[in-house]
């Protein structure tokens, strides 16, 4: 999404991710168009802006597709607008690498994941040297991250508090909490 318009390259990446995780590729257009309408829509019919992947159901995405996408995507908003962020090749799953790099096959992506477990890529050039047939790769890749999701869980007898926080690493190196979500629940106590 850029200036209220769907970016074809980003839509193609989301379509590849949908295909990789085994859901209909048309879901990608539904998500992209729904997000666009939520951002620029001014009518009462405009959808609410989802703040989490689970809320993609607001855009007409079925629960099974949301569950399939949940481990691989995050909606990132700052001041009400989407923030495009590069994919960190040192932390991305094989599925995300397959989607992010046009022409990448799952076996090559899995091989790259295994390589980086031994030695993380220090530069993007180190990464692209491993896949010369696919170079040049998108500028939407990097070897570091600026945004992180941190999850915590505290259990006290039959109560559980789960907290998810979205952090941004500032250029100074300091981390700032952008979002925090707390969920309290009761657990079944086996006895």
PLM feature spans:
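Compositionally biased linear targeting/interaction segments
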Residues: 1-191
């Amino acid at each position: 999404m850029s200036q209220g318009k769907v970016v074809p390259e980003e839509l193609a990446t989301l379509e590849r991710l949908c295909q990789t995780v085994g859901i209909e590729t048309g879901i990608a257009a539904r998500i992209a168009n729904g997000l666009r309408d939520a951002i620029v829509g001014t009518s009462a019919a405009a959808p609410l802006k989802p703040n989490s992947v689970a809320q993609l159901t607001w855009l007409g995405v079925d629960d099974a597709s949301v569950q399939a996408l949940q481990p691989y995507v995050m909606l990132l908003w700052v001041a009400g607008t989407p923030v495009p962020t590069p994919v960190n090749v040192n932390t991305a799953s094989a599925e995300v690498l397959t989607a992010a790099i046009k022409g990448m096959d799952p076996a090559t992506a899995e091989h790259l994941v295994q390589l980086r477990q031994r030695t993380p890529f220090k530069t993007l050039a180190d990464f692209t040297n491993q896949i010369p047939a696919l170079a040049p790769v998108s500028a939407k890749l990097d070897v570091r991250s600026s945004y992180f999701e941190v999850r915590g869980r505290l259990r006290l007898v039959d109560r559980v508090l789960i907290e998810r926080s979205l952090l941004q690493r500032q250029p100074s190196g300091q981390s700032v909490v952008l979002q925090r979500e707390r969920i309290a629940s009761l657990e079944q106590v086996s006895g």
